[in-house]
């Protein structure tokens, strides 16, 4: 994010190289994600902003249920260390409707969610399709596959990544975050029909 705009990672490389390097460092052990193609026309995974059709409190609660002690939301943590803040933007669908949007089912394990494991280096292209707003429904909870992933991470003593096996809406371009509501993942869900995107300070 630069100013009030959330940029795809690949655009950050030109716009804000220091922030790009900080975000890129989060791909340690899964660097192949940086070159992962998600469409026949060559669109890359990180040519998009990754949004989730799930209230972030569901992610927090799933971790709490398993005793993973997720951190409380804290804006200063991201500002001072670049680490996860627990804060998300609430993004109404009509706010991004003029952009190219893809629906990503996130079913098949690949290096993005399983760093340093023997899994494919790119996701199957058939898990991506043009986004259809008329079919969109917010997920009521994390997927069964995500819950199983969290259990596996706990059993192996590893820190879980945030959105493994959670479907995504991928936005192929920047998102103006001015006037978007910021929500904390440790606050309970309200009834809304929007997407969430991680706040990057």
Cite the ranges covered by each PLM segment.
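Active-site-proximal loop/hinge segments that shape catalytic or ion-binding/gating pockets
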Residues: 1-49, 56-201
